[in-house]
Each structure stands twice: as C-alpha cells, then as structure tokens.
Amino acid sequence: MGFVALLCGVTLDDRRTSNPIVITGDMHCSWVFDLKAYYPDEDSDTVGTEFVGTSIASGLGDYYEEAYRGHLDQNPHVRFFDERNGGYVRCDVTQEEWRVEMKLADSISDPDSSVRTFASFVVEDGKPGAERT
C-alpha cells in the first residue's frame, strides 16, 4: 500500500472530515489538486483538496515543465499547475468556505515585478474539491 496511501487513509477515514484541505509549499511550482479516494480510478470520489504554493523566488521552470507538464492529461485531478512563476497562496477562510488566490509574480528576477492572481478557487463547507472562480 505504501506510506503515503496509508497515511491518507488514516487521516481521512479516522477523522471523518467532510472536506479536508491540505496546504503546503515550495515545490518550485504551483498546484491545485482534488484529493481522490482511489487515484487509479479517475471517477473515484473527490475527498478533499490540496493547494501547493511555490516560493516567491523560485526559478526551476524548465525542469518542472519537462518533469510534469507532459503528464497533466493523465492526471485529471490536477485543477491548476504553473511551473514558470514564483509566488504564494493567499487564503481567506470562513466557516462557510475556503477561498484561495494563486498569486504569482510576472518575473522572479525583477524586484519591482507585478504580482497578480493567476487563478482563484473556492472550497465550500461540506463539499470536497476546489471550484475555479
């Protein structure tokens, strides 16, 4: 089964959370994933959401483009991916919803570069999975 699968099962099954959210960072690229009950079956239930933020000064775009971009069509649970821009994840959390803005800089080499919202998502209470807004 593997450690990660076992950990996910324990975390999600034992806690009975209606829409768990994982937020993590600095993979040198930005992601939004649906967490699936069983990844080999793309039609399995969505049980949560993961938001991954990059570092504001990340600069490994070419590597991640080669490593990941070609596999996105095989991973329909990926809702957003950006390997080119450094940035951060901005969250606004209430009891009703979790709103996320994927904030990314136009340039990591220019300290005066604009930071803009590349994508926005919402996770509603009791409804697992992120919806793009």
Model-derived regions: residue spans:
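Long, structured stretches of catalytic cores involved in phosphate-ester chemistry, encompassing
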Residues: M1-T133
